[in-house]
């Protein structure tokens, strides 16, 4: 472990010694004298060492600190020359200088490594996210391709706005020079006019630019959310058992928002800053090349500060994402099960859980804000030091007659702006990595292949409804070692009612889930009219095989929306016919708007029996050939049960009833008893076998 960690550094030292030996000989004689030769030497060292380490796959943190090692000496002598005001300052080459200069370079690298090791979060040094991030960025760009016209318009307005903003300080300097010298009314009026013109034009263009980027952001956000939601609904049930609801909600809300702002928001700031920096440096060079080169020294300082700050910032942002998702999960569980929470008097316990989750969020927010404040203080101190240095050199140039007072004012305004935009450019790198991190999670869901067979195409015009379980076994994906069903073999015949009974955990609901094609058997075959269930078209199958659960799930919307759920072009007459068959027409008729009455979230405005009737009507409106009732009549009165019995007698439908009551079993034509996933009994009703008699006796005693 230790040897593999030291290998890049040892390789760097040996390669650098060999290269410096070459530069000390005939190769070094080819280099020019002074600062140009020093910079060529540093650049040559950087390129060769970078290439060798890249070939050996040894870059990592060494590659991050390599520019400091190779360019620290040229930067030092360049700074001394710029501050002193002369480029003829004697310089030394690292290859031919004393060992002190080389040790100083490696000392700076060692100090930087120590700072990096202390301030960077664990694991950052070992990460190599470049290639992966580039792939994700390409996918984000591809996702934004439909909005290319709006992005082009936004970029046009961006260039116009930035150019206008860049010219304003130039004319401000002219005004100062006019007021400080011989006053020329025409020149003064011209300068003021152009200042106003560029101010108004840049403001208008900036508004158009921002509007175009925001419009693009909203379009991308909608597109990502639609694709993600569509992908989630196609996943297998095992995925939802393994993934928390709070995590899915977080991906659909916060992560998709981060993704949608990646291109519009970052492109807005990135391109604006880039164009602004280029334009500002152009005008700064016209004022004073010496001051311009001096201001360039702020770049490595800014990059170094961001290099330390960004990994910490990204790490804490990821922790905040997880903490917020957990806090949201507590709220959703408590509110979703409020009746249970209240019935057990657990309000204070849930509040305590939420306070703990919020406290974790607060600690992370405080840590994020503290680190950001410390970083901003360091940046402002560095900016102030650079400004003082430029002022000192600027005064020397004014005294030498090289720069006017107005020119120095323009330069200081430019320099303040360019520092801000350079920081924006460097900051955008970290922000883009943050958003790409969110995109990685979303893309993992978009790319996930559901553990489901390929959809079938069978959709016969008529279905008999004969169901055959042939030696069917099943285990849930999360517990493959624990079989739920073992070797089930039975047939459900059209025109018969089969009761499936057994103790809790025997596998009754799993049989219903397999019959709906929600899971696939791990062994054996499940046939419908002699064809494997997976061969049928998805929508066709779920029109022909329908389940009504003991606790029906309803959705916010009207009565009609819930009965006709999943159906297209379902007429009101069909809805009312199904409601009448389910004995739901009486309470629907008493509602204010009939079948168009809103029933609230999860059908909260209905009683339990009314919910079951709507769920039965939702199944009957499809006119299924196979109907599964998971004790779905437990909350119905005798009249409604009789109406359902009448519907059963119409047509040769196949019916499977998961029974928990003696009354339901007595009305069945066939009884199947499950125990520990095995079919214990498969005889006709009222044969009086021991297992079934024992079950009936237990029910009567209960």
UniProtKB/Swiss-Prot annotation:
The peptide-binding site is shared between the cytoplasmic loops of TAP1 and TAP2. This is Antigen peptide transporter 2. One of its GO terms (cellular component) is TAP complex. It is found in: Endoplasmic reticulum membrane. Residues 151-434 form the ABC transmembrane type-1 domain. Residues 28-56, 120-147, 208-265, 314-373, 429-702 are cytoplasmic. NCBIfam families: 3a01208. It is an enzyme of class 7 (translocase). ATP binds at residues 502-509. GO terms for biological process: antigen processing and presentation of endogenous peptide antigen via MHC class I; antigen processing and presentation of endogenous peptide antigen via MHC class I via ER pathway, TAP-dependent; antigen processing and presentation of endogenous peptide antigen via MHC class Ib via ER pathway, TAP-dependent; antigen processing and presentation of exogenous protein antigen via MHC class Ib, TAP-dependent; cytosol to endoplasmic reticulum transport; peptide antigen transport; positive regulation of T cell mediated cytotoxicity; protein transport. PANTHER family: ATP-DEPENDENT PERMEASE MDL1, MITOCHONDRIAL (PTHR43394), TRANSPORTER 2, ATP BINDING CASSETTE SUBFAMILY B (PTHR43394:SF14). Pfam families: ABC_membrane, ABC_tran. Residues 1-6, 78-98, 169-186, 287-292, 395-407 are lumenal. Belongs to the ABC transporter superfamily. ABCB family. MHC peptide exporter (TC 3.A.1.209) subfamily. It comes from Mus musculus (Mouse). The record marks 16 as: Inter-subunit salt bridge with TAPBP. Heterodimer of TAP1 and TAP2 (TAP1-TAP2). A component of the peptide loading complex (PLC), interacts via TAPBP with MHCI heterodimer; this interaction mediates peptide-MHCI assembly. ABC transporter associated with antigen processing. In complex with TAP1 mediates unidirectional translocation of peptide antigens from cytosol to endoplasmic reticulum (ER) for loading onto MHC class I (MHCI) molecules. Uses the chemical energy of ATP to export peptides against the concentration gradient. During the transport cycle alternates between 'inward-facing' state with peptide binding site facing the cytosol to 'outward-facing' state with peptide binding site facing the ER lumen. Its cofactor is Mg(2+). The chain crosses the membrane at residues 7-27, 57-77, 99-119, 148-168, 187-207, 266-286, 293-313, 374-394, 408-428. GO terms for molecular function: ABC-type peptide antigen transporter activity; ATP binding; ATP hydrolysis activity; metal ion binding; MHC class Ib protein binding; peptide antigen binding; TAP1 binding; tapasin binding. Residues 300-388, 413-432 are annotated as: Part of the peptide-binding site. Residues 467-701 form the ABC transporter domain.
